[in-house]
Swiss-Prot record:
Its main location: plastid. GO terms for biological process: translation. This is Large ribosomal subunit protein uL14c. It comes from Cyanidioschyzon merolae (strain NIES-3377 / 10D). InterPro entries: Ribosomal_uL14, Ribosomal_uL14_bac-type, Ribosomal_uL14_CS, Ribosomal_uL14_sf.
Amino acid sequence: MIQVQTRLKVADNTGAKEVMCIRVLKASTATLGDVIIVVVKEALPNMMVKKSQIFRAVVVRTKQAVRRANGMHIRFDENAVVLIDQENNPKGTRVFGPIARELREANFMKIVSLAPEVI
């Protein structure tokens, strides 16, 4: 579960390393596949994103376990997001780490195709 003020890792190559959630869209908390508004807290120099910029992001990994329809629970070691634009396309060209299958059901197919592993 991601709520306002939660700090998350960035799982793409946009140059942002850590972001903070400042708004959850359509609910009070976000889980896998939900879109949130984030502000960049830590970024690499000379990259496409800078500190204090605001972006939309989709949650791809959460520490809180999520129950699937078959009864299985899925959880990860960290909370992570991928930065997206207004058309839900990823801003980066690579995605790092495993991605949950719930993103396929939420129609983030470009992120799923960039991911090295879908769990």
